[in-house]
Amino acid sequence: MQQIEVKRLLVNYKTLEEFRNFREFGAAELSMKDDLEANIIENDSESPFYGIYFGGKLVARMSLYRIDGKYDRYFEPPQDYLELWKLEVLEPYRGKGFGRALVDFAKSFNLPVKTNARQRSNEFWTKMGFEPVTYQTDRDRGESPYVWYPEGVKEQLSEDEGSVETLEN
């Protein structure tokens, strides 16, 4: 297979139009159209959206947000980390390495990566080297959190309960 290149997507109306394909053919739960529209309105030039084009068509995409370490009570040692949201590959392009390429791109920053398994994707995240973590309502925005830990990083435990500390957003 040819080299897969992950690109930062521009926050503009062309990208919005490309996202409509995902809304039409993808899972409604994974729609990023509203997220992109909010970034256009806010004139946010630092796009959190990344994607892969195949044959001139956007076929895979995700949101990737860097969270400042000063807000981290999740990892030991506390540090910056990434939140990966709404990874989606259009149905005809699944099983071709596009999802793995997006995940590998996120891992290339060598920071912990948090995500939430949606659309029965638990097996995919496990295959990508992510570990399921216990869901906590005051910390996690989704009920099926998964984390990838780079070498030397582990989950931070509270001293009194032995449970995971919360992350306030």
Curated annotation (Swiss-Prot):
Keyword check for Zinc-finger: no
The GO terms describing molecular function are:
acyltransferase activity, transferring groups other than amino-acyl groups
EC number from the UniProt entry? 2.3.1.-
Asked if the record carries the keyword Acyltransferase, the reply is: yes
List the transmembrane segments: none
Q: Which UniProt keywords apply?
A: Acyltransferase, Transferase
The N-acetyltransferase domain extends over: 4-160
Pfam families on file = Acetyltransf_1
What's the protein called, per UniProt? Uncharacterized N-acetyltransferase BH2580
